[in-house]
Structure formats: C-alpha cells, structure tokens
C-alpha cells in the first residue's frame, strides 16, 4: 500500500465496489454522522483506491449525496493486490467504527467466501489485521494534519489538495507562521507557491494518479507537436517559435535519465552530454501546468534548442529535456 495524495473529488465520481462493501457491516451511527456533517462540514476525507473505488467512507458518501454536497476531500492509496485492498478496507472500518466482537466475528464469517475454512479464515485474517494495523496507524497523523489544516487554514488546505503536498510538513509550516498567517493567506497564489517552494515543500509531491494523468496529457500534447526550430541552436526563444515548424516526424518525449544519456551519446552532443549528466532528473510539472492552462504570458524565459540528426535537445530555463524521432 502506497500513499497517493490528497484531493477534492466529485461525489458522483466515487465508485462503490459492491463485493467489497458486503464485507463491511452497516454503520449504526448514520444520524449522528449526518448531523456532524451538517454542523461542521465534511471533515474526514473519504479513502479511495487508485481506481476511484471507496475503501473507507461508504456512509459519508451516501450522506453527502443526500445533503447535496458536490465535492468531498479524498485520500488516495495505491494497492498492490486485491487482497491488500480488501484487508485495508476491513481494517480501516474496524478502527473507525470501534466494532464489537460480534461485528468482527461477522467479518470473519464473510471472509469465508474466499474459500478458507472457518478456522483458517479466523487465523489468517486475525494475523493480517494485526499487520495491517501497524500500517494504518501511520495514516492517523496525516489525517489529523489534514483536519487541522482544513479547519484552521483553509487556504493552505486548498493548496494541499491542488498540489498534493505532504500534510504533516504543511502543518509544521502553518504552525511556524501562525502568527503571520493573516498576512500569508491574503497573498496571491503565485506568491504563496514561491514561499512554499523556498521552504522546499513543493518538492514533497509523491507519485499518484492525478500527477500521472497530467503527464499523460502533457505527453499527448507534446507528441502532437512534430517539430522545433530548424536552427542548430536558438537561444531565448518563445513558446510560439519553439513549436513553429512542422516536418511530419513524430517524436517521443524522453523522461528517464537512462534514456536521456543513451540518446545523448547517440547524438554525440559532447559538452551538452556532460552538462546533462549533472542535471537532476526533472518532471517539469510547472511547465506542464503552463501548457495546460494555455496562458500566453507563462512563457519560459529561456529556451535553447540543439537540433541533431536523431532528434533535438531542449533546454528550458536551464533544465534539459530531449525529444527524439521515433
């Protein structure tokens, strides 16, 4: 199980796995939960898997729909197998609801549907729940950090969901600037991000579905652009001239350090290769956001293009990328 990020998501996009939901006893505190949501808002994020299926929060999702709530906070977890996903769902609900022994026994009985004998099911599930409990406890500080940010610093909570920041690090940042928070929250988003970047908080992004989706969209955009300027080197270009020419040669965006070094060697770039080896591997997420936003003012200050027979080496504000002919 791997942490995948915090987001806000449309209630209508949340999926229910009917088979998995059968393993979870009905919540007998629906009315109390509904009253709390009406009074305090949707404080506890729904936990979903990488495919958008609810792992924990069935009752809250149903209540949100009843109350006409359009979007709710979610935590994404990436599971390696259906078995891990099922164990986590059961354990999360055991912890959250403080189930009675009778309810836990019902879970054991439902686990028999996997084909194990009653004795084997009880023994196996009990062992796995104990192991899972250790991992689930690591989630509690993150959830607490999310709750504090959501109630005390909604402006930071918005950035948390939007940029998939580490909630515990962001909470530490909030506590350190709490005295000046009224000033901070009035700053434009660009200035807030500049401050977070200087504190290295924006570097805490973990791999998660939304980020992968961004890169898939960006790669699709990049592959639709089939050429760059034909000069051997073009300094301080702009976005329009960068994508000006069309020669019909489809190109593949190269992201991995290994692929980059191999292609540089094939292209015989010499000093550029040495420089590239010293560059940290970058995902250029900000550049992607600029492309997706369509902002004509968000043009990189410096674009250098080195055209070679097998492709083009591109330096955007000092960071090196490569587009190679397929």
Swiss-Prot record:
Top-level taxon: Viruses
Family that this chain belongs to: Belongs to the ParB family.
Official protein name in the record: Uncharacterized protein ORF326b
Organism from which the protein derives: Acidianus two-tailed virus (ATV)
InterPro entries: ParB/Sulfiredoxin_dom, ParB/Sulfiredoxin_sf
UniProt cross-references to SUPFAM superfamilies, sorted A to Z: ParB/Sulfiredoxin
Family annotation (CDD domains): pNOB8_ParB_N_like (cd16404)
